[in-house]
Amino acid sequence: MKMPKTIGLVHFIGIGGIGMSGIAEVLHNLGHRVQGSDQADSANVQRLREKGISISIGHKAENLGDAEVVVVSTAIKKDNPELIAAREKFLPVVRRAEMLAELMRFRNAIAIGGTHGKTTTTSMVAALLDAGGLDPTVINGGIINAYGTNARMGAGEWMVVEADESDGTFLKLPADIAVVTNIDPEHLDHYGSFDAVRAAFRQFVENVPFYGFGVLCLDHPEVQSMVGKIEDRKVVTYGENPQADVRFHNIRMDGATSIFDIEIRRRRTGQVIEIKDLRLPMPGRHNVSNATAAVAVAQRLGIKPEDIARGLATFGGVKRRFTLTGEWNGARIFDDYGHHPVEIRAVLRAAREACQGRIVAVHQPHRYSRLSSLFEDFTSCFNDADTILLAPVYAAGEEAIEGVSSEALVDRIKAAGHRDARHVPGQEALAPVIAKIAQPGDFVVLLGAGSITYWAAALPKQLAEISGNRA
């Protein structure tokens, strides 16, 4: 049974969240009555309001109104007044992933999973399906620049969704195609052990129906190990590994554009298809790998090589994924969501490949628990940066942990041999430091999942004001 149109008014608690807003938008576009609330106004809230969705700022029991269904994310705590009121009224309370799963039942679905790279890969798969004329519905974990939103209602039979593994609910998603980009020890507070994370991703792939398939990255040792354990389901592998079914090679750079070739091998027939000189307007081997995952999906869905090439060449990227926010004195300033050592290392390596000058990395660690559990990994992930500026930890509601701080990380990075690592006490201190060290041709890359995105947006203007005052 598919979700009927008669479910009544749907209320989203925390509707401005990146995952919740996309689901709310698609539900609204399908003709359902949708409303919601959020703690603060935001771009997502404004976008939904412009579509006619009523949104209250602040959480109060009366916000429910005539709601007959309530949708919550894992960020909503049990003492939320709206959640308490919903249960007192005996209303059905639906987890975000459950509602996403209901939407997926209306389409053939592609779910993109992995510890890193999900948002970009979801966007790339959507771009290639668009280029192939399949007009997909998309629900993503980031703003797709081509759409100006994280969700889009298509007329075609396919849906592309980002599968969030953080709380295990991605196992509820009824995907026909499951993509796994990588598996790293994240979200151990939920899973308890890395073995449990591994088991969840294996289940994610084995959940696809017999007529579906998994798309797995053979370059990542954890994913490669999982390939041989997948039972009774088709698997397509991709990566730079010569054994991959869909293999990228011959990477070159043209400024910030990656150029590469792809070789597609069909195991049963031995047929080999080559697509040469693909152009992707993003630097970095990790982005080429993500693009190859998208190609692996697209070619299985019958999209022609010339459409694949066009879709990649015109790919507009994702907000907060190496996003240029401005220039100052010939130095370029970028904003990136990277907050895990694996992500930071990949972003800075990509910056190194594209940059003619020096790399200045500005990082705001996100959560004390993450910095504590991955402290040693953080000491080496900035190696491609010439200068490292570390801001105070963005707590995200956590209590501080003794001995875990940006200052301690600076000391450890220096002890490990880095020549220029510094602590920056806050946003107001950043622009004066950058003004002294940034030179023409340099990249200034701000990284983190917290408020540092606002620093990145404001920095070009702050630098211009400093240079104007000097004049």
Swiss-Prot record:
Principal subcellular localisation of the protein: cytoplasm
GO molecular function terms attached to this record: ATP binding; UDP-N-acetylmuramate-L-alanine ligase activity
Location of the protein in the cell: Cytoplasm
Binding site for ATP: G114, T115, H116, G117, K118, T119, T120
Enzyme Commission (EC) number: 6.3.2.8
This protein's record includes keyword Ligase: yes
UniProt keyword annotations, A-Z: ATP-binding, Cell cycle, Cell division, Cell shape, Cell wall biogenesis/degradation, Cytoplasm, Ligase, Nucleotide-binding, Peptidoglycan synthesis
Organism superkingdom: Bacteria
Family affiliation: Belongs to the MurCDEF family.
Record's function text: Cell wall formation.
Entry protein name: UDP-N-acetylmuramate--L-alanine ligase
Organism for this UniProt entry: Rhizobium meliloti (strain 1021)
Organism classification: Bacteria, Pseudomonadati, Pseudomonadota, Alphaproteobacteria, Hyphomicrobiales
